[in-house]
């Protein structure tokens, strides 16, 4: 039986139950959360991360689209309050966008500033962050939200190389990783290559959620689909 982590998203775990897995996000796997703009990709990632924090799962959170303060504000809108997890260092954040907007903050043990325009620096800080959360637990959650800005500031193949290194590091350390991406940011060939790098994909289109899991050990792809809603408490999946 494949071990999974409860998602904290009502209806999602029931949707993904199978004879192979208990339902939820497969533990120590990588998942691409993608779809058109404004369909709940960031909400899905944040909801999963917050559920983990509630259960004392350390989280490495890389934000490239919005600065730390905006991330906190967005999560607060769903009553997901993360300040205490920042203070107790369960949550480790790498802010890859605030430097570009001129917003400055002091680096701390678990808050690091970087730049999407300097992916080498980001990867160094991801390495440091991964070691930090791994020391707390040999299983943790990692979020990268999102690939969009990385593609905007760097050549596509460079981003793919960075992503491969990020995913490899995540797997080696035992992290369960979610990465967000908006369809159409790159060409179709790059998107297909992107999807092939992940163990699982979750597509949100504003009405339907489609989950595909590639179980390499048995050479089988499992697929599930349902409708979903975005509520004031986050995403709710309506069941099979």
Where are these regions (language model features)?
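Conserved nucleotide-binding/hydrolysis micro-motifs of P-loop NTPases
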Residues: 65-69, 98-102, 148-149, 183-187, ...
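The Walker A/P-loop phosphate-binding site
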Residues: 1-78
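Loop/turn-to-beta-strand initiation segments
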Residues: 58, 90, 137-141, 172-180
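Phosphate-binding/switch loop-helix module in NTP-utilizing enzymes
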Residues: 99-165
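NTP-binding/hydrolysis catalytic cores, primarily Walker-type P-loop NTPases
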Residues: 1, 6, 27, 117, ...
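Nucleotide-state-sensitive switch-loop elements of NTP-binding domains
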Residues: 75-114
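Catalytic-core regions built around general acid/base machinery
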Residues: 48-52, 129, 161-172
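Phosphate-binding/switch region of NTP-binding enzymes
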Residues: 175-176, 180-240
């Amino acid at each position: 039986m494949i071990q999974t982590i409860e998602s904290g998203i009502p209806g999602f775990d029931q949707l993904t139950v199978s004879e192979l897995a208990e339902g939820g996000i497969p533990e120590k796997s990588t998942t691409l959360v993608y779809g058109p703009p404004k369909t709940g990709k960031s909400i899905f990632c944040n909801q999963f991360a917050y559920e983990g924090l509630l259960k004392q799962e350390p989280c490495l959170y890389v934000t490239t689209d919005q600065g730390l303060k905006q991330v906190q504000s967005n999560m607060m809108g769903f009553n997901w309050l993360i300040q205490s997890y920042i203070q107790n260092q369960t949550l480790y954040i790498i802010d890859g966008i605030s430097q570009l907007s001129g917003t400055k903050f002091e680096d701390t043990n678990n808050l690091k500033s970087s730049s999407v325009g300097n992916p080498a620096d980001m990867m160094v800080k991801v390495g440091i962050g991964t070691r930090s959360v791994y020391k707390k637990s040999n299983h943790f959650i990692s979020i990268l939200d999102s690939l969009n800005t990385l593609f905007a500031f760097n050549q596509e193949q460079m981003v793919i190389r960075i992503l491969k290194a990020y995913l490899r590091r995540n797997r080696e350390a035992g992290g369960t990783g979610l990465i967000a991406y908006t369809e159409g940011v790159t060409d179709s060939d790059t998107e297909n290559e992107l999807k092939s790098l992940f163990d699982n994909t979750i597509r949100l289109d504003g009405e339907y959620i489609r989950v595909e899991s590639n179980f390499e050990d048995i050479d089988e792809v499992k697929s599930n689909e349902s409708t979903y809603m975005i509520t004031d408490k986050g995403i709710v999946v309506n069941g099979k």
